[in-house]
């Protein structure tokens, strides 16, 4: 790691005047090796807290296993040997201790990817596995590890089983505030190394497109008939992923009101749709997502800026917490701060570091982030916090800035009175009240602010109020959508088949990191490909210790 001695004063603090901001991290349980007991969990959380983190996407379903004692999914290999007393398991301990520290926890779940080793699903539910064009369960993606294993998104039983698992998870852990869907896609593939050719998928596709396979058709004949309709086949598979997102949304909306649904996606819609069958624009249009976490894993600032600016115009009813990876790629302190600042400058509502190990294992980065946020009198609020808290925090910040700028006291108090009136009228649960507050704040910011602030300080007051308007507008639009969800999730699903064998801990040991840093393949920009490929080559030894997420 270079340039770890850069002083915080050499780069403007990204925390300046930002009292509302998501500062998140994706965290794999025990990624540093110290979370084998409660003391280790507390140590990790204390470090994250002092680096300004207010949101943790905690890896909860990965390699086909989980980190709590579920009735549907096996407990992760080795965790039964750890003692988290007085808590019964890792997840119980982490969520409780994070909540004590004011850190919000969302469950990060890897929907269809189930690892590289034989496991519970391959042993007891092999009929649910994704098949390539040639009928293999090993995908071309992840060939360096023998090929990834995926569940089949086109299988209604797969989708329902996962929905049932997420319902169990959210029921057992009411303090988990959100569900972050990762691997919400098919394996990376193209026309020439295609995948998804299960009997369920091919039969469903034929039915949807209105053609029939010949009686006694062989698998090869069915594959050929499907493959010759390639564009429709891409659309069909993307539709199955969208159906799953809709099912999860419906479950959360009807049974876990208040839980936030988010997805980790690549920012390039064209490649995401064609290569991964990931149609996030439709998810946004249907109002499924409360938060989107675009994985903008670029090293250079220009590419990061372009990626975020390309997405943000379509996110009027969805928070954007931008995924960045400067610490994972061992970038300089200056570049880390630049990336954090770029997320703010482009209009993102916050940032999420991938991944926690690249901070927890680097004292220089810990010191850098601690310096950035040490002057704060209180941790930053999350943009999706209660509306009264958002208004109160904004009012206090505006008062501080205007007073320091010499704004007359009577002007400041007049503006604060306007904000207090808005706070009294707001209610996160009442769509009409939220829309009225949205309207009044818009009038104040866009047309009437000059009545309460002198011209010299107009822009100073306007920036935090515009941010507040953004957060309240998302809330109002989300609330309206959940009150009247519009288009229903397509196609009904059947109850999941329950295997005869209940989940037990697999005997195989999963690698610490079965996933390669595959940014060069997925980012899709020529210049970025070369740069990222070089970074990946340099990091290849470290990958097994700190997984590069999809």
Regions found by a protein language model. Give the residues of each.
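C-terminal low-complexity, Ser/Thr- and acidic/Pro-rich disordered "stalk" regions positioned immediately N-terminal
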Residues: 485-520
